[in-house]
Amino acid sequence: MDAREMKIKAAEAALAHVESGMRLGIGTGSTAEEFVRLLAEKVAGGFQVEGVPTSERTARLCVELGVPLKSLDELPALDLTVDGADEVDPALRLIKGGGGALLREKIVAAASQRMIVIADESKLVETLGAFALPIEVNPFGLVSTRIAIEKVAARLGLSGELNLRQSGDGEFTTDGGHHIIDASFGRIPDAEALSSELNSIPGVVEHGLFINMAALAIIAGPAGARTLQANR
């Protein structure tokens, strides 16, 4: 079973949690896109859902495949969000934001009664941090914000490169007009402390640590998909 087949298995298992009539947050990334494709097949057969996309990229795919969409302002309370992750630990703490949609992903997840994370087994880790932590920042005062992040990291015993994410034509810009600093801290022993410290920096719009948000993680491997509940 290759990586895409594992993503499809995880998406299939998540789809079993979606009931007709649900208000559904729809994530961003390659695994979430497999979920959208499967959801679209059910919608074509008469399955009723209303989706709130977490990125313009996801919105375009939903429109292309016929998944009905609303804005979060139109549906401010959601039943369920299904989204991918870059890393998942045993407590279902996550690193997200590799696709650049972390702010909207977190807003949509927070507006949902439940969040289900779907991923292949390569994303399951004992401790977060092998994947660089995306930190969404305001373009104004970028150097000052970067220095503040470095100071926070030093206080917590973390170090590593802080790289401003690039795209083909310069700095990567999120759907909200912000930039992303990818922080290669390595192992993050206290994700809660780092989350709190980053939240205190005025120039930090959001970060990719999702803590106490996921209710379930569906992890797919060669033997199929398994469901993990938070070990908190």
Curated annotation (Swiss-Prot):
InterPro entries: NagB/RpiA_transferase-like (IPR037171), Ribose-5P_isomerase (IPR050262), Ribose5P_isomerase_typA_subgr (IPR020672), Ribose5P_isomerase_type_A (IPR004788)
Reactions it catalyzes: aldehydo-D-ribose 5-phosphate = D-ribulose 5-phosphate
Keyword Isomerase belongs to the record: yes
Complex formation: Homodimer.
CDD domains: RPI_A
Organism: Rhizobium etli (strain ATCC 51251 / DSM 11541 / JCM 21823 / NBRC 15573 / CFN 42)
Keywords: Isomerase
Pathway(s) per entry: Carbohydrate degradation; pentose phosphate pathway; D-ribose 5-phosphate from D-ribulose 5-phosphate (non-oxidative stage): step 1/1
Domain of life: Bacteria
GO-annotated biological processes: pentose-phosphate shunt, non-oxidative branch
A Pfam family matched in the record: Rib_5-P_isom_A
GO molecular function: ribose-5-phosphate isomerase activity
Active site per the UniProt annotation: E105
EC numbers: 5.3.1.6
Protein name: Ribose-5-phosphate isomerase A
Residues holding substrate: T28, G29, S30, T31, D83, G84, A85, D86, K96, G97, G98, G99, K123
The protein's role, per its UniProt record: Catalyzes the reversible conversion of ribose-5-phosphate to ribulose 5-phosphate.
Family: Belongs to the ribose 5-phosphate isomerase family.
